[in-house]
Amino acid sequence: MQLFDVYSLWNIEPVEAKGCRVWDKEGTEYLDLYGGHAVISIGHSHPKYVDSICKQAAKIGFYSNSVLNSLQQELATKLGQLSGYSDYSLFLCNSGAEANENALKLASFKTGKKRIIAFKEAFHGRTSGTVAVTDNPSVQAPFNKGHEVVFVNLNDIESVEEEISKGDVAAVIIEGIQGVAGIFQPTDSFLKQLDSVCKTNNVPLILDEIQSGYGRTGKFFAHQYANIKPDIITTAKGMGNGFPIGGVLISPEFEAKKGMLGTTFGGNHLACAAAIAVLDVIVEESLVNNAFNMGEYLQQELNKTPAVKAIRGRGLMLGIELKPEFSDVRNQLLFESHIFTGGAKNGVMRLLPPLSISKGDIDIFLSELKNKTA
């Protein structure tokens, strides 16, 4: 059997990883400033993380959600305390797309409506509902196009108000920072207005924090810079540091009913053990503060680099727009300097390193970037 060929792949096969480093099968060492799409939050193969998973696997790795699992409540309690959402409820699933799909369902259940407001250039996932609210027709099959969705410009509150005034909106969904689009963020003032408009009109606001959450921006969630509390928050990626897990944080305004949501694998013992270890390490190593400080340092130094046209983002979720003559720098960094970075629309370089990255590793990147653009 062959693999279904849908991925554009680099001719590199990592076989080992530790901290902010990966090694390929030839033994070449790479500095990882991408973390596999912002998944690696506490660093590759963190000892506490590895120990937690191994010990749990030796006890019980899985049983379905037909029995008690105290690890789920331990995870919910720690996540609530660290994120500032102790009064919310947690639904556990397996991925970001699944988290967003369930968030959209919850909003529709509550309002009895089905039309969704999303934002141009958004990316929310590849399941039927999430791909419908993703502004990319090339990944939408005819089957996905029956959903009622309207896309408005980011930071355009008038367009949001106009759509909500029609009275048929089930929810508004927005990314804490748009990642795939090229690192574009809603302004704090816009998020405050959006939160106010949604609350006034009883329209649930869903904050997709799958890429921007879990401390990446220097706060636990990116929307917390705006001091708002959305109705639903979704998370995944950095939540499991590579182990598949997703979560939906749900306001007390939503009433749980048996069977309204469900999953076979979501919240299994291994996934919870991984996610608990991630939260423990984030606290013990002050990784949210490190993300803020290292992000500030990165932006400060990048602003001194003549080849850089623009820098966007917060903390360790940054987009670097280089001048056109340096369009091949990402390839040069990967194949000559052995540094992984990410891409986004319009040639933007995305930096999404582990939250544990050191100033020394950032300096290596900055030095190589300057050399390649001199």
Tell where the protein language model's regions lie, with residue ranges:
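Conserved N-terminal phosphate-binding loop of PLP-dependent enzymes in the Aspartate aminotransferase
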Residues: M1-A374
